[in-house]
Amino acid sequence: MTPVKVWQERVEIPTYETGPQDIHPMFLENRVYQGSSGAVYPYGVTDTLSEQKTLKSWQAVWLENDYIKVMILPELGGRVHRAWDKVKQRDFVYHNEVIKPALVGLLGPWISGGIEFNWPQHHRPTTFMPVDFTLEAHEDGAQTGWVGETEPMHGLQVMTGFTLRPGRRWKSPAASITATPRRVISCGGPTRQ
């Protein structure tokens, strides 16, 4: 069996830009948003979108075996943007060929297509922001692409991994969720312990 190939590259995707994020976090109450309170501190909200499409370069992480090829975009929340069936020559998850945000996420921008990871709620706050990623090689020739973050609103450290194995027609998802001992506080002032 051929080992799984993994690589990183820049890909150009037609993209509609967002406006700037408000630098002043909103302390909102009673703004119910898809089961949440609507509070967004310490983030700012983006409430404008561009109507101009440009060709933008995004970092892509690829996993490929004899049957499928998967593209993960760490700069867009770590989503699986494309999953291609090499045998049937077609996408097996919805592949949106254009990045065109809509203002439906908790902080504003959200895009359709691919597989989006959500924590602590639907259309998570950082769904349109960069996340950390790492690659893990396994002895059997498999490769895992991990994406994750420590989310400052709730102090959750979350990682999602996709493992692609040689000779298999599917990818195996895995998740790790850790409640950090203290909330991450993004401020410049003194804090008490």
Residue ranges with predicted function:
Residues 2-40, 60-130:
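Acidic-aromatic substrate-binding/catalytic surfaces of carbohydrate-active enzymes
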Residues 27-56, 60-64, 112-169:
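Extended, loop-rich substrate-binding clefts of extracytoplasmic carbohydrate-active enzymes
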Residues 4, 55, 107, 116, ...:
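Intrinsically disordered regions, especially transient/low-confidence alpha-helical propensity segments
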Residues 70-88, 148-193:
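Acidic, contiguous internal or C-terminal segments within carbohydrate-active enzymes
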